[in-house]
Every structure is written in C-alpha cells, then in structure tokens.
Design a protein with these regions (language model features):
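Fe-S-dependent hydro-lyases/dehydratases of central metabolism
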Residues: 1-218
Length: 218
C-alpha cells in the first residue's frame, strides 16, 4: 500500500518541465541531485520542497518503527493505523492537469524522486517522454478521467491500498481514498493505463537502475 501526500496541486492547463525544474541557475547543480532538487517547482509552488521533505522525514521515522502523529491520523481515517503502518509507504505526490510539456528533461522527474516523490496524478501527460521518465524513477504515473473534479488541496492525502499487487496484476483501474485535512474521506478512481511488462517491473523494482541491477545479479 502507499499513501501519497499532495505536496503540490496545480490547475494550470499545462505544466512544463521548466516549471517542474527550472533551467538557468540550476545548471551548475546537474551533478548534485540533492542540491538540484531544492529548485523543484520553485517558480510555481515554492512550498513544495519543504512539504515533500517533511513527508520524507516522516516516512523515515515510520521505517524506524515509529508512527508520527500525522501518519497515524491519516491511517486511522481508513483503518487500523497500527496494522497499516507496517505495510504502507508514505511519499509526496504532485497533481497537475497536464504535466511534462517542453524539453525532455530527466531531472523534471528525478528531482521529485530525490525528495521522496511516489506519484503523479493528472488527466493526461503532455509528453510520453516525461511519463517514461517518471516510470524510470519509480514514480507511479496515475491519471484520472477527464471531467473528474480534482478539488483537493496541498496537504490532503491519497491512500492507495494494494497498489503493488495492482501493478503486478496489470490492473488499470485502481480505487483510492482521499483523506482531506479536515479528516473527511472520499473515493477517487485512479488509473495506470498502457504499462508494458518492463515498465511494470521497473516500478516494482523501484526505478530503472534497480531494474538493471536485479537482472545483472540474476
């Protein structure tokens, strides 16, 4: 299972790769992924990096066997928090209507992953290359149906039960729950359509590098 906290919600018609990770002043940091990631969405959602880092820190605590109060509250909204804590990973997510327009900039996806990004949610991807980059970095490329309202906000959380099994079984329709900041819970149907077998295995392995490492080891 995974739970993705919405660290950025962008309702512009299109979100470009230059908005996801600006060019120019960032070019000197291309060999420093941690420093480069500090610029993610800096021109569009300045709060994104801090929010994503906070979620990543809480996930690190969960991995150590702790259960931060925020994560406990999220899990309590959908079930037994103590039972779910051991099987639910937490990460950040970005919603944008149509992300990835512009140059084929790998860092537009890799910087999200460096900050603990688990998922993107959109109506469609502007380019196949950006979607592929997300997959190669282990970011779940969710879509929702055109016309489905997405009136959620930064800080709301998307809980996706059995997502690993859904990817393994090539399911394209994946029911999820959205836990709003006020504690209310709503259903949301997510989709991951058109994944190849290799793409599914890349996501399951965590990223393209892990995918190749596993096959070299075999």
């Amino acid at each position: 299972m995974c739970s993705s906290d919405l660290a950025a919600v962008i309702h512009d018609p299109v979100t470009t790769t230059d908005e996801l990770i600006p060019s120019g002043e960032t070019s000197s940091y291309r060999s420093n992924p941690l420093r480069l990631a500090e610029f993610t969405l800096s021109r569009r959602v300045p709060e994104y990096v801090g929010h994503a880092k906070d979620i990543a820190a809480q996930e690190a605590e969960r991995r150590e066997g702790k259960l931060p109060e925020y994560l406990k509250a999220v899990l309590s909204a959908v079930g037994d928090a103590a039972a779910l804590a051991g099987t639910t990973q937490f990460g950040s997510a970005v919603f944008a209507n149509k992300p990835g327009d512009g140059s084929a900039r790998e860092q537009a996806a890799s910087c999200q992953k460096v900050l603990g990004g688990f998922a993107n949610i959109c109506y469609s991807y502007a380019t196949k290359r950006y979607r592929s980059n997300c997959i190669n970095w282990g970011i779940l490329p969710f879509t929702i149906d055109e016309g489905t309202p997405f009136d959620y906000a930064d800080g709301d959380c998307v809980f996706v039960p059995d997502v690993r099994r859904a990817v393994e079984e090539a399911r394209e329709d994946i029911p999820a729950k959205v836990i709003r900041k006020d504690g209310s819970v709503e259903d949301l149907m997510l989709h991951i359509r058109g994944l190849t077998q290799d793409e599914r295995e890349i996501i399951l392995d965590g990223c393209l590098m892990n995918y190749y490492a596993a096959r070299i080891a075999d």
